[in-house]
């Protein structure tokens, strides 16, 4: 019975992490998403940290609020059984960059930063008309 509980906990953690990461990527606070799905921000935190299990109905609401198909939350689940670090330095930096980016109120400045990142990533040439 313990093995099944371990697997269930890993699945809950996997889905919670996907919710957390996507929420940050969308620039939503925990409070903002919680209001949309009609739960408290504390309850959403419990979902993200896999303290409480998410019902399928609630997961559908979360998927809609984050503009994703529900399948998104299960993509890569097979890999979840492999041991992975909780947060690498790189992941922490990505989260910090995302949080700071969302604090920029100017759309033009956000676009300029996005262009710079694309340039540094080698995706396109730097645009200077912003």
From Swiss-Prot:
Keyword Transcription: yes
Annotated ranges, domain HTH cro/C1-type: 19-73
Entry-linked SMART domains: HTH_XRE
DNA-binding region: 30-49
UniProt-listed InterPro entries: Cro/C1-type_HTH, Lambda_DNA-bd_dom_sf
UniProt key word Transcription regulation: yes
Keyword vocabulary terms for this entry: DNA-binding, Transcription, Transcription regulation
Single GO term (MF): DNA binding
PROSITE patterns from the UniProt entry: HTH_CROC1
Stated name of the protein: Uncharacterized HTH-type transcriptional regulator RP497
């Amino acid at each position: 019975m313990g093995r099944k509980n371990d697997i269930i906990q890993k699945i809950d953690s996997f889905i919670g992490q996907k919710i957390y990461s996507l929420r940050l990527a969308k620039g939503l606070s925990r409070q903002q998403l919680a209001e949309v799905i009609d739960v408290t921000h504390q309850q959403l935190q419990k979902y993200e940290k896999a303290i409480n299990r998410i019902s399928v109905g609630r997961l559908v609401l979360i998927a809609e609020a984050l503009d994703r198909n529900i399948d998104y939350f299960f993509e890569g689940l097979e890999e979840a059984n492999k041991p992975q670090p909780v947060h690498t330095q790189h992941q922490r930096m990505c989260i910090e960059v995302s949080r700071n980016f969302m604090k920029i109120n100017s759309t033009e400045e956000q676009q300029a930063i996005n262009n710079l990142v694309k340039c540094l990533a080698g995706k396109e040439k730097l645009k200077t008309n912003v």
